[in-house]
Every structure is written in C-alpha cells, then in structure tokens.
C-alpha cells in the first residue's frame, strides 16, 4: 500500500516523506544527520529534508523545513520565535515530548506568533495529548502525527494501552475535521513503521492520513 511517512529518521517502505536530521547528543545509530538527509533529498525528490536546529541556531542548507527539539537543545519558546523571525521557514516541526522543559502553552505561543507558517507537532504531546488536540482544533496551520505515541502507549503493537492517549488518537482519527490534518509518522528506527501502518489501514480516514493530507501540505509549502 502506498503511504508517506512524515516523521522518519531513516528510509523503510515509505513512498516518500520527510526525513528528519538528527544532530547533537545523544547520538543514535541508524539515524540520519543533516548532511545525510540533504544528500538523500538531492538524489531522490520523493524525500524532503527537515534540518535539525541546534542550540547555537546555526545555518542549515535549506530553511524551508526546520526541526526544533527543545528537550535535547534546551532552547525556550521565545528563542524559537526569535529564530523563526529571520528564517525563510515554511514548515516548522517541533518535538512535543518535552516535559518538563516546555508546556503545551509554549507550543501554542510559537504557533500564534507565526500565522504565515505551517507546523507539524509530532508525537502529539504523549501524555499531554488532549492539550495538543486542542491546539490542532483551533489552529488551521497546525498538523500532527502520532509517531512514537501510537506504539509507546499501546494504540498499536503489544505494549500496555493507556486509554486517555489511545482514545485520544481514535477520537482524532474519527473526527471529520481533525483527521484532515493528521499525517502518518513512524519515528523509525525507534518505533515500527509496519505496526503503525497496519493499524491505520483499518480506519475510514486511512487514505487521507497515509497519502492525501501529506500531499496537500507539501503543495502548500512548495
């Protein structure tokens, strides 16, 4: 089945998608650096590079898609807002598994300060899923993916199921409004692309989540 993976650190079976550079510490085997995602995207136009922004807010090869990771880099929401103000960024990806460094309101603050940019909030906050679904509901420039969260909290796979999180995923996927801004993300190689894909194919919104929503978002930032 054709699908795009909007949150992967390596290539598996996706027809294309966003490849996220991983820089800084700790280093993880089988993940791609900024230099590697740049090289892949130049050779294969099915993949778009998301360049990792470090705490020094240094230059990256292309500012169109940027990835911020507050938990690893310890920058504040105000610092990210300031950095985005002089970047030619069209799509901003901000890791949401950041307790205790950021709270959900910090993400809302960054989104509100950048109405001209699109955002992907990957992992949809983990334990804080309800707050991030609220951000999704009230901000038309926000997309989410459930990478990591979908498997870690037992929505798919064999781990124990945490109802508030798994039910939140189901609620979002069954919402005609919200499901239009959900992207498939796996977080490979940390979590299974295959397990998640199998579960998504059972939902009425599968074609949108696996293909259409991604294609529409990419068209908006071209």
For the regions a protein language model found, what residue spans apply to each?
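Active-site gating/metal-coordination segments in enzymes
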Residues: 31-101, 140
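Conserved, mostly hydrophobic/aromatic
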Residues: 7, 37-41, 123, 144, ...
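Catalytic pocket-lining loop regions of alpha/beta-barrel enzymes
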Residues: 75-183
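Short, well-ordered alpha-helical microsegments
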Residues: 11, 34, 57-58, 103-104, ...
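Active-site beta-loop-alpha junctions enriched in small/polar residues
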Residues: 9, 22-25, 52-56, 69-71, ...
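Mid-to-C-terminal alpha-helical segments outside catalytic/metal-binding sites
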Residues: 1-6, 171, 176-181, 191-222
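Hydrophobic faces of well-ordered beta-strands that scaffold small-molecule active sites
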Residues: 3-8, 17-20, 48-51, 64-68, ...
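An N-terminally biased module of ancient metal coordination in phosphate/nucleic-acid-related enzymes
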Residues: 1-42
